[in-house]
Regions:
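His/Asp/Glu-rich metal-coordinating catalytic cores
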Residues: 3-178, 184
Length: 184
């Protein structure tokens, strides 16, 4: 891929950290597997992408402010709309104009389901001609945790009072952001 990558400013900032970090981990794992493969007479292992690939990718990013219409090609304009899922998450409105007719397509991944201290709630799209949306959890309701900060504080206090060590695994970016916000 040699084109531009349009992303919200927050997503571009997050990617500058995450892409390189993930590439570094992949390179380390590939080195480990290559050493293991060499002992078994197997070919070397290659990472899916390298730190150099991540750096090249990051140069293609075009950070875009949330809510502004951005022309990307003849007759095609896009606008990022806050999805409220994690910092920088967005639905994207694509405006396709042919002659006097403009159609709007909306693409979205996860949508936030509540206001969090570090996030605004999601913005709603008023109208669209076509909508494509991720729906992994579309068939169920999430029961809200009454007070996640109080629950986390209780767990921390109990662990420290018992002389224990606290480990909080949070593999998803959104959950990590929520936990860090609660701890703050």
């Amino acid at each position: 891929f040699r084109g531009r990558i349009y992303a919200t400013e927050e997503t571009a900032n997050l990617c500058s950290i995450m892409l390189k970090d993930c590439a570094h981990i992949q390179e380390q794992e590939a080195q480990w597997k290559t050493r293991k493969n060499a002992r078994a007479g197997l070919p070397p292992e290659e990472p899916i992408y390298s730190v150099a690939d991540a750096d090249a990718c990051l140069k293609r990013f075009r950070p875009c402010p949330m809510g502004e219409k951005i022309p990307i090609a003849e007759g095609i304009t896009v606008r990022f709309v806050n999805a409220g899922h994690l910092l920088g998450s967005a639905s994207i409105e694509v405006f396709l104009t042919e002659g006097e007719t403009t159609r709007k397509m909306v693409f979205s991944g996860d949508l936030g389901n509540r206001d969090l201290p570090i996030l605004r709630g999601k913005d709603y799209v008023a109208q669209a001609d076509y909508v494509l949306i991720e729906s992994t959890y579309g068939d169920r309701l999430h029961t809200p945790c009454p007070d996640p900060t109080a629950f986390l504080a209780k767990c921390i206090r109990e662990t420290l009072d018992a002389g224990g060590n606290l480990i909080i695994p949070a593999f998803a970016v959104a959950r990590t952001q929520e936990i860090l916000s609660c701890l703050h």
